[in-house]
Amino acid sequence: MLILKTMDDAQLGVLYETCMRRDFPPSERKSLSAILKMKHRGLYDVLGAYRADGVLAAYALLYHPADGRVALLDYLAVEPAFRHAGVGSMLLAQLRAHYADAADVLLIECERPKAAPDETLARKRIRFYTQAGAQLTSVRIWLFDVEYSILVLPCGERIPACDWAEQMLSLYRQMLPKALFEQNVRLIRA
């Protein structure tokens, strides 16, 4: 069993400088100042998943606007010592329960396998999320020079009908300054 706890700014700073720098390439990592700004505005959740002995096993960062019924799973990683032991799946199950009253779905960006530097790893990530109940949508989006496929993970029992492309664009319009959005966010039409 994992215990979900909201991380404070100091914990986030340590997490960012150690874990996030290790777990995510620069092209996929927002700046710490951008994350803190969204967190202070109440739009961003930074959650640690701890074992009963208080050791951090995994973490997740989510963008969740107060007026929306979706949350964007921006980052999820399992500490190296706990990988391949079901910790990531446990965390996803807990995130679904944690957001059940506030969101219908968690939107997930996964690097598109055919565009990824490591196609096998990208396929494994998508398989991890689909095995946890997520559905791969037809939506593809280009964010800051990285091409992503979009998955939808229900927080309840079903996925509501929705224009997921518009949901993603709407989230990024809210998250980014207009000029940054216009320069770095593109929907890819199949």
PLM region descriptions:
Residues 1-34, 50, 154, 163, ...:
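Short amphipathic alpha-helix that is part of the acyltransferase structural core
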Residues 17-18, 25-80:
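A conserved beta-strand-loop-helix scaffold within acyl/acetyltransferase catalytic domains
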Residues 68-70, 105, 146-148:
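A generic structural signal for beta-strand entry/edge sites
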Residues 73-76, 150-154:
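Short, well-ordered beta-strand segments in beta-rich or mixed alpha/beta enzyme
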Residues 78, 84-98:
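Conserved acetyl-CoA-binding loop-helix of GNAT-fold acetyltransferases
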Residues 99-121:
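Conserved GNAT acetyl-CoA-binding A-motif
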Residues 117-119, 124-149:
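Conserved catalytic-core motifs of GNAT/GCN5-like acyltransferases
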